[in-house]
Amino acid sequence: MAEFRVRVSTGEAFGAGTWDKVSVSIVGTRGESPPLPLDNLGKEFTAGAEEDFQVTLPEDVGRVLLLRVHKAPPVLPLLGPLAPDAWFCRWFQLTPPRGGHLLFPCYQWLEGAGTLVLQEGTAKVSWADHHPVLQQQRQEELQARQEMYQWKAYNPGWPHCLDEKTVEDLELNIKYSTAKNANFYLQAGSAFAEMKIKGLLDRKGLWRSLNEMKRIFNFRRTPAAEHAFEHWQEDAFFASQFLNGLNPVLIRRCHYLPKNFPVTDAMVASVLGPGTSLQAELEKGSLFLVDHGILSGIQTNVINGKPQFSAAPMTLLYQSPGCGPLLPLAIQLSQTPGPNSPIFLPTDDKWDWLLAKTWVRNAEFSFHEALTHLLHSHLLPEVFTLATLRQLPHCHPLFKLLIPHTRYTLHINTLARELLIVPGQVVDRSTGIGIEGFSELIQRNMKQLNYSLLCLPEDIRTRGVEDIPGYYYRDDGMQIWGAVERFVSEIIGIYYPSDESVQDDRELQAWVREIFSKGFLNQESSGIPSSLETREALVQYVTMVIFTCSAKHAAVSAGQFDSCAWMPNLPPSMQLPPPTSKGLATCEGFIATLPPVNATCDVILALWLLSKEPGDQRPLGTYPDEHFTEEAPRRSIATFQSRLAQISRGIQERNQGLVLPYTYLDPPLIENSVSI
């Protein structure tokens, strides 16, 4: 006989406790104990409780390998078993007769009656678990999760996603918490009611004037939104949004003018000033290009029975000398030059120039929402999440490292497939390119996607924007990338002693292969790895995954409402075609081109919700679920948190000197995962 003390920790969330009966079986090198009830006098397993139990094993099972946790509803006389009551277990701690503690992290919901098997908390890669019982358990765990979380092809040419139709179909481990879910719907309900009471969601006509638009601008406005309202017509603000707005990933240094963008010296002389030329500035590296060519010929939507229009503009920008502002030099609204595609200039009539800039901003909306936001910052993180759940067991160090960065991602993406990107919902009702345009853009971009785009340092180098001043997305993002990379490198160094150890980890290689096949559709031209051969490659890959799921999403999601609250700054649709000549634009024509009232308010409401985390947040580097139990990774986590705190202090100090602070990549404001 052997006496064990069992300590159990129950989560603190609403509903985490249970009335169900819990027992454990201890599996060792010499056998397995029968189920041992965890039963004290009174109520066990209340939310937030840590409770001790004494259990007696009839025989010595040897060195402990696994813990089987059994949960079943209580049985009442005459009535029989009650309905199962879900339980969130944080961890078990076993104290064997000879002393010492064995910690078994859990951090899972146990919903129905059944058994959950836990391994002692020391992280181990696949080749490090030598005992056949442990090897078998790893395989059985992955088989069960692969049955639970299955792939489906949502749209042709898109990354694959979770095969569930609604959030009601999701199991508790991937659902919003009760508090987060309640806050989300309370926020949505109050905002919808405010718009509805004002009658704005039912008005299908045009805005009467820019002044009338100010009515809607009072809706939940922010300091950044007020700045956009005050400066949206200014060239410097227009250009700055390519650096620090919601789509800071498209601007690139221009070393030569595209043949289909025939800007001349005479056109831009007034901005460049005397003593220079386009060629001189190209050679100096002071010209930049934003090309929305991927939008060329994209399918457009019908809103309120009226066809919408889209453009595929090219915008040439000039970095003023002496750290002056970035300024727009020229805009062409199509990819085909000619008499019907004039090049618009800052010296043109006010309304001609403003209309051209507004067409660029509409292109930014379409590009950002379909690609930068939906594809790169939601669909790809869902791929990383699903592959992690399906291919890495709980005891794998990469599972422990990555699982905090997958929290709620499957819930919010399933919700998006319910409420955003389906017929009759906001993308279909109120955006200029609609669902079909979104789908076509994603299909096009998937064929162009490459690994360097996903790795920030390479992306910055490829676009040639290493030294453009005032590019805070780059500055803050590179600091965070560096902190994540150092953290990941330390963790990888603990568990992978050599390149061969990376190659020999079959679970890691299966994870990478599944991401390549299901996420990137086996496109070798993308440069996305289908296997990893070195520790250096593994560090870069895992850094990319964590950065994409946290900082990248924050940078391109949190500012959506700030940019669109004053709709002319980021119109979701355009109701008249792009101008084919100059000198015809007027204030009335400008307003007639903008989206109707109901579409404006529909999109603003949606982007307000998508910019606002509904509580239950976990900032980057915050890991309350302690999956790692060893001292070495815990020290690395503490160091990572210190680095992030130092980065935050620097960002906040810099922001004190900015008219418009850049806050989207301040670490305390970055969520660990894609959760909204």
From Swiss-Prot:
Induction: Up-regulated by UV-irradiation. Changing A416D: Loss of 15-lipoxygenase activity. Residues 2-124 form the PLAT domain. One of its GO terms (molecular function) is iron ion binding. Its main location: cytoplasm. SUPFAM superfamilies: Lipase/lipooxygenase domain (PLAT/LH2 domain), Lipoxigenase. It is found in: Cytoplasm, Cytosol; Cell membrane; Cytoplasm, Cytoskeleton; Membrane. Binds 1 Fe cation per subunit. This is Polyunsaturated fatty acid lipoxygenase ALOX15B. It comes from Homo sapiens.
